């Protein structure tokens, strides 16, 4: 890392959000508390630690904050790929506030949040046009993205391997009506992948999410113009992938953007902070507000605007069923979150360290 003042133009090339020093009060306060420290971005996250960078070409292994090593330290308060940190030599001394993020409820019975990526402009939700194609899973990803401040874009790969790409787009037309961009492409073809260029401009950061075998690593290699990321095929019987990406990593692209590739995720649990309207269901939520009863379950109640829309072929009944399922999951997670916050507030009086829950603002 450099021992002089920050080189902000170079930092901008890896996603620094301003042309000079930080302009947000919360960031200024952290800088003021660590006047000898320099900013860097987390570009890799491993079980054993982090790799950070302050230029597109140079990176180093970083020593994390001691409290991050404690087993009970909240995982979402540790640094994630895309986070900005302050460094003194090789030591991380502070985590800067997140401007955006995508999170999920971590696997297990106890309530935990896991940050998938931080300080991102765009989330590419990648799904293959083979047996991997699953509109319900796409909707689940959209729910996790909604409210986190980033722009979702649905990317349908393997368009060269099917004659039914237009049919798949038609299935998702209710999403496109909500201004959620959809792109069907061949992840191996640079001309086809150029459809993503509007979201990969200089200084912007995007993250790829999706199941194993969806084509995320292939897409990364095409955007890089080189075979940097290892790729494997998928099993022919079910089109399931083999986890070619094993850790999250931030990669500078020739376009000037940064791309975060992530391992495939089998479990996509809500955190309880999601907004269904912002998470791809604004049309269903708007109709639900017109139902005769405030607690309408949208099953057989009189005056149900949602059922009326289904019967008029204006809404996909399977999508509405998924909406209702996700609504229950979000409510359940919100109850667990409220319990956790209450426990933390009680911990303040007992001298225990409370675990805050970050809520990124929209950029």
UniProtKB/Swiss-Prot annotation:
Its EC number is 3.6.1.-. One of its GO terms (biological process) is ribosomal small subunit biogenesis. Coiled coil: none annotated. The keyword Isomerase does not apply. Keywords: Cytoplasm, GTP-binding, Hydrolase, Metal-binding, Nucleotide-binding, Ribosome biogenesis, RNA-binding, rRNA-binding, Zinc. Signal peptide: none annotated. One of its GO terms (cellular component) is cytoplasm. It is an enzyme of class 3 (hydrolase). Pfam families: RsgA_GTPase. CDD domains: YjeQ_EngC (cd01854). Its main location: cytoplasm. One of several proteins that assist in the late maturation steps of the functional core of the 30S ribosomal subunit. Helps release RbfA from mature subunits. May play a role in the assembly of ribosomal proteins into the subunit. Circularly permuted GTPase that catalyzes slow GTP hydrolysis, GTPase activity is stimulated by the 30S ribosomal subunit. HAMAP family: GTPase_RsgA. Monomer. Associates with 30S ribosomal subunit, binds 16S rRNA. This is Small ribosomal subunit biogenesis GTPase RsgA. It comes from Xanthomonas oryzae pv. oryzae (strain PXO99A).
């Amino acid at each position: 890392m450099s021992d002089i003042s920050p080189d902000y133009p170079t930092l901008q090339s890896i996603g620094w959000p301003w042309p000079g020093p930080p302009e947000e009060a919360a960031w200024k306060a952290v800088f003021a508390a660590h006047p000898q420290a320099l900013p860097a971005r987390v570009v890799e996250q491993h079980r054993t630690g982090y790799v950070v960078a302050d230029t597109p070409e140079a990176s180093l292994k970083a020593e994390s904050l001691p409290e991050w090593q404690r087993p009970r330290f909240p995982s979402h308060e540790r640094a994630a790929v895309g986070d900005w940190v302050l460094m003194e030599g090789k030591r991380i001394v502070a985590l800067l506030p997140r401007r955006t993020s995508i999170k999920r409820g971590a696997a297990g019975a106890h309530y935990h949040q896991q940050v998938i990526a931080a300080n991102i402009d765009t989330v590419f939700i990648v799904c293959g046009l083979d047996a991997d194609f699953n509109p319900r899973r796409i909707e689940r990803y959209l729910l996790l993205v909604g409210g986190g401040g980033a722009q979702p874009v649905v990317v349908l790969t393997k368009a060269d391997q099917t004659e039914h790409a237009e049919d798949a787009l038609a299935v998702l037309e209710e999403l496109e009506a909500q201004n959620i961009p959809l792109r069907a492409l061949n992840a191996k073809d640079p001309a086809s992948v150029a459809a993503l260029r509007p979201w990969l401009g200089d200084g912007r950061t995007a993250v790829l999410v999706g199941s194993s075998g969806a084509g995320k690593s292939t897409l990364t290699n095409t955007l890089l113009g080189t075979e940097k990321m290892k790729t494997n095929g998928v099993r022919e019987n079910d089109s399931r992938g083999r986890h070619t990406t094993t850790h999250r990593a931030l990669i500078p692209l020739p376009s000037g953007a940064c791309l975060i590739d992530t391992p495939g995720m089998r479990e996509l649990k809500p955190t309880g902070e999601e907004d269904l309207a912002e998470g791809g269901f604004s049309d269903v939520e708007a109709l639900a507000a017109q139902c005769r009863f405030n607690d309408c379950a949208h099953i057989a109640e009189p005056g149900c605007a949602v059922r009326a829309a289904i019967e008029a072929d204006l809404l996909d009944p399977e999508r509405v069923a998924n909406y209702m399922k996700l609504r229950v999951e979000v409510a359940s997670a919100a109850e667990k979150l409220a319990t956790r916050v209450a426990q933390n507030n009680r911990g303040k009086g007992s001298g225990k360290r409370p675990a805050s829950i970050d809520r990124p603002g929209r950029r």
